[in-house]
UniProtKB/Swiss-Prot annotation:
CDD domains xref list: EngA1 (cd01894), EngA2 (cd01895)
Entries under Pfam families matching the protein: KH_dom-like (PF14714), MMR_HSR1 (PF01926)
Subunit structure: Associates with the 50S ribosomal subunit.
Positions of GTP 1 binding: 10-17, 57-61, 119-122
Spans traversing the lipid bilayer: none
Species, as recorded: Rickettsia peacockii (strain Rustic)
Biological process per Gene Ontology, one example term: ribosome biogenesis
Protein name: GTPase Der
InterPro entries per the UniProt record, alphabetical: G_ENGA, GTP-bd, GTPase_Der, KH_dom-like, KH_dom-like_a/b, P-loop_NTPase, Small_GTP-bd
Stretches assigned to the KH-like domain: 358-443
Length: 447
């Protein structure tokens, strides 16, 4: 039995994202008092009491004649078509506005089961005739922020959905096993959402020429070559000095948080915008968090054929110069809008994810250590004794982390550590991922 789908619809700033977070098993949506914060439809597992369902949050719709408004309507229409039940939300403080009337007509034409949810009702609330004129036979007053009225909402949802579907325990999602979480990050307008839409063949994410369309992290469950993948589209990261709007600060922190919990990060670069320090800063942040990384240069179709070879040479030089700690990062050149080379990106993610999870036996590690330290001797200490690394073992994966036991670890230089790490990459085929060494002092410094 699949989960029932409930879609939240309403004009901007009526509290859809607040209710989405309230019903979600974990918080997902950015909440802000600026209209239009949500710009894509977002999915999460929701729960009220014992009833579990799939919840969709939609962009706030208003009378907007520009292309952005048309795309918001398209996103909401798709979410309505997917729904088993619609919660049409209005603001109880401001009352019924002209946009509410237009939207209610828009929703009712699809003949879906629907509930009018009047939000921001912290006090006792009486429905006047304006609410009845919207044409919904079920009306509930709630405060999503404070959680009041949710029991009434639960009862109304159960009444609206087929009993055998809603009351029974829902079977978990059919996709099982490890989930590879891939975060797509980069500067604004690099083509992150276009890339994800091309991969899944669905206009799930709002795209367009306006920089900063995606304002929060959007998660999409997907399967690729029998692998369960969660694709996460993030807001574009700008330099801190250029982030002035408070909502964008929230979006930036949401993106950074997504990177922290990712397995692999796709760093999207705009081929028409030169590689900037901010791109390198994002890559360094990913590496410092211990994530695996794939660099993708998008809009490759817009680069002149005569300039591509020189572009690639300069690009590889910049990456190798500024990110020496992760030599061998996969770099792919794609056109998301033309779907050129996009599957190669997923293949690279699967490959580097495998390396990121690599486990090396202790015997092989110490055989390698003995050979490598003899090929390039460690420095001498005072008194003529040589620094030694006696033994090493792998303590964890994701990223591969190793403990090395030395008689005097303080004397091991950063350059010698880089020598060991780079040698390990080649010996054990571990390109493009962070490798961490932890030095531990042996009890007997003379051993």
């Amino acid at each position: 039995m699949t989960k029932q789908i409930i879609t939240l619809v309403g004009r901007p700033n009526v509290g859809k994202s607040t209710l989405f977070n309230r019903l979600s098993i974990r918080k997902k949506a950015i909440v802000h008092d600026l209209p239009g914060v949500t710009r894509d439809r977002k999915y999460t597992d929701g729960k009220i009491g014992s009833f579990e369902f799939l919840l969709i949050d939609t962009p706030g719709l208003d009378e907007n004649p520009n292309s952005m408004g048309e795309r918001l309507i398209e996103q909401t229409t798709k979410a309505i078509l997917e729904a088993d039940l619609i919660c049409f939300m209005v603001d109880g403080r401001s009352g019924i506005l002209p946009d509410d009337k237009l939207l209610s007509s828009f929703v009712r034409k699809y003949n879906k089961p629907a509930i009018l949810v009047v939000n921001k009702c912290e006090k006792a609330f009486d429905f006047d005739k304006e609410y009845y004129k919207l044409g919904f036979d079920s009306m509930i007053a709630i405060s999503a922020e404070h959680g009041t009225g949710l029991i009434d909402l639960y009862d109304e949802i159960i009444a609206k959905l087929p009993e055998e579907e809603s009351i029974e325990t829902n079977i978990a999602d059919p996709i099982k096993g490890d989930c590879l979480q891939i975060v797509v990050s980069g500067r604004p307008n690099a083509g992150k959402s276009t890339f994800i839409n091309a991969l899944i063949n669905d206009e799930r994410l709002l795209t367009g020429p306006e920089a900063g369309i995606t304002r929060e992290s959007i998660e999409i469950d997907w399967q690729y070559k029998n692998n369960h993948i969660k694709l996460i589209d993030t807001a574009g990261l700008r330099k801190k000095s250029t982030i002035t709007e408070s909502l964008e600060k929230l979006s930036a922190s949401d993106t950074i948080n997504s990177i922290k919990f990712a397995n692999t990060v796709i760093l999207m670069i705009d081929a028409l915008a030169p590689l900037k320090q901010q791109d390198l800063n994002i890559a360094s942040h990913v590496v410092n968090e211990g994530r695996s990384i794939v660099i993708v240069v998008n809009k490759w179709d817009l680069v002149k054929e005569s300039e591509k070879e020189a572009f690639q040479e300069e690009f590889y030089y910049q990456i190798n110069t500024h990110l020496p700690q992760v030599k061998g990062i996969p770099v792919l050149f794609i056109s998301a809008i033309n779907k050129q080379n996009i599957e190669q990106v997923l293949d690279a993610c699967l490959k580097i994810y495998k390396i990121w999870n690599k486990k090396i036996t202790t015997s092989k590690l110490n055989e390698w250590l003995n050979f490598t330290t003899k090929a390039h001797l460690l420095p001498l200490q005072k008194g003529g004794r040589r620094v030694r690394v006696k033994y090493m073992t792998q303590t964890k994966t994701r990223p591969p982390t190793f403990k090395l036991f030395s008689n005097n670890p303080e004397k091991i230089t950063d350059s010698y550590t880089r020598y060991l790490v780079n040698n390990m990459r080649e010996a054990f085929d571990m390109p493009g991922i962070p490798i961490r060494f932890i030095y531990v002092k042996t009890k007997n410094p003379y051993v």
